[in-house]
Every structure is written in structure tokens, then in C-alpha cells.
Amino acid sequence: KKVSVASAASAAALGASVKLASDYTDAVAKVGTVADLQSVPLEKLRDDMLQLSTETGRGAGEIADATYQAISASVDTADAVSFVGTSVGLAKAGFLETADAVDVLTTIINAYGLEASDAGRLSDILIQTQNDGKTTVNELSQSMGQVIPLASAYGVNIENLAASYAQLTKNGVATAQAGTYLKSML
């Protein structure tokens, strides 16, 4: 009886491993549909994504999905895996999913006409906002997406927008409500 329980556990683990490998293969194929494979071959992207997964402890499928999302949001293929690495760091420090970190960073980059290489500085700004206010980067990522394009259009830089969120939330205004106030003011 003990052997059959152990066999069942081994079979379940094997099945889960096969599923993860299949999901990762699908995610890499998806990256290949948007990547500039002339600048970075798919094999190199795959190797870099696996390396980032190992370094960060995040699943390879999650890294591949985030890479697809980053490239789809206009991050150059050559910069995508590094950008995702920065996004993983923001996700860990800001209490959010990697996909949400990619989303908020690409929203800022696209709205302000910045580069993927600015992701580290932008992550620092978001973490500083979290530290100075009563908010998390997760809450900011859900609220800022509606405000960033307007702020950019009206010449309000990301530093001032972030400081506004920090000040409002520090004074007891919920992050979502702060976004509504800022959007109305703009």
C-alpha cells in the first residue's frame, strides 16, 4: 500500500512537471510572435529567460509571459529580459505580480516617452512613493494607469505625480481615491 501511495505521488509530480514544461514552451512560442528575432534569436531569449527565472526564483512561464507583455508594450526585444528582471524586483518590493509591475512600468515609459533603461529609476520612484505614503506599488499600479497619460499630457512629470500620491495617501486618502482626485485636478 505504501508503494502505491508513493507511486501516485511520483506520477502526480511528473504530471505537474510536464504541465509546467508545456506551459513554458507555449509562453516562449508566444514571445516569438512579437519579438524582433533578427536582433535576438529565440534561443537566446529562451536561455536568458531561463537564467532570469533561476536568478529570481520566479517561474519560467511567468518570466516568459512578462517578456511577451513587455515586448508587446513597445520594449525593444534586446532590452526585454533585463526589463523583466527590473520588473520582478519591483514586484517583490512593491507587493504585486510581475505582470502588474511590467504594466505600470510600460505605462509610464510609453506615456512619458522614456526608454526601457529608465525602468530602474522608475521602480525607485514607485518604491519611494510606497515608503513615503500609505500605499503599496500594487495599489499604485491599479490607480496610476488612469492618471499617467493625463499627467504626461499636461507636463506633470512622474516624480511630481508620485509625490502627489505619497502626500495624499499619507494624509489618509485611499490610493484609488487619490487617483480620482489627481485625474480631476488635471
Write out the residue ranges for each language-model feature:
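Small-residue helix-packing and pore-constriction motifs in hydrophobic alpha-helices
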Residues: 2-55, 65-73, 80-94, 100-132, ...
